[in-house]
Amino acid sequence: MGQKTHPLGFRLGITQEHRSAWYANFNQYANLLKEDNQIRTYLNKLAKTASISNIQINRNGLSDQIQLNIETGRPGVLVGENGTGIKTLLSNIKKILPPNRQLTINIIEVEKVNLNASLIGDLVVEQLEDRVAFRKAIRKAMQSALDENVNGIKIQVSGRLNGAEIARSEWIREGRVPLQTLRADIDYATKEAHTIYGVLGVKVWLFKSEILAK
């Protein structure tokens, strides 16, 4: 039986970079990993309203400095009026961390939201939760990406589609999505839509281009 490999993990070091960049001594590793997970869990709760697409955590060697790079399609939502939002964000994340940690947050705007698998997934989820038919929701999201001249896109929705009694999976693809080609710059994201019929799973594969000289 065929096994599917995660498109991003498969390309680490080739077209993708690690989402956390740090090293630690053996006795510290578990605690730092737990800190990363707590930070991501907190930020993922804000992901839908703030359109957060990626969270990059960098630590400066064995010191207590943490640099948090947040890529978002709506930077104004995170920053807030007169920077109040970013101050609240900084304060809430520091509550998760030990008192000796020094935290820096960089907000990075995603310029082309229709070329980002995570933000396309958010668009599909938003429509599904508004009770739009799943095929219509997929087509609308795909068209927004195709207007940006991507090489290919595939979107899959799983669950009780349109309120059906039996759960199933359906997908639509436009263009090429070469998952076995390592030089292919594939963006991938998974999302959940909470509807009155239950939870629907959404997966988005986005083939941007081939990277030949990396």
Curated annotation (Swiss-Prot):
Keywords of the record: Chloroplast, Plastid, Ribonucleoprotein, Ribosomal protein, RNA-binding, rRNA-binding
Listed InterPro entries: KH_dom-like_a/b, KH_dom_type_2, KH_sf_prok-type, Ribosomal_S3_C_sf, Ribosomal_uS3_bac-typ, Ribosomal_uS3_C, Ribosomal_uS3_CS
Give the record's GO CC terms.
Answer: chloroplast; cytosolic small ribosomal subunit
Q: Name one GO molecular function term.
A: structural constituent of ribosome
Residues forming the KH type-2 domain are 39-111
Subcellular localization, per the record?
Plastid, Chloroplast
In terms of PROSITE patterns, this protein maps to: KH_TYPE_2, RIBOSOMAL_S3
Which top-level group of life is the source organism from? Answer: Eukaryota
One GO term (biological process): translation
> Which positions make up the signal peptide?
none
| SUPFAM superfamilies xref list | Prokaryotic type KH domain (KH-domain type II) (SSF54814), Ribosomal protein S3 C-terminal domain (SSF54821)
List the NCBIfam families: rpsC_bact
* Family as reported in the entry's similarity comment: Belongs to the universal ribosomal protein uS3 family.
> PANTHER family, per this entry?
30S/40S RIBOSOMAL PROTEIN S3, SMALL RIBOSOMAL SUBUNIT PROTEIN US3C
On assembly, the entry states:
Part of the 30S ribosomal subunit.
The entry's protein name is Small ribosomal subunit protein uS3c
Q: Which organism is it from?
A: Trieres chinensis
Q: What is the taxonomic lineage of the source species?
A: Eukaryota, Sar, Stramenopiles, Ochrophyta, Bacillariophyta
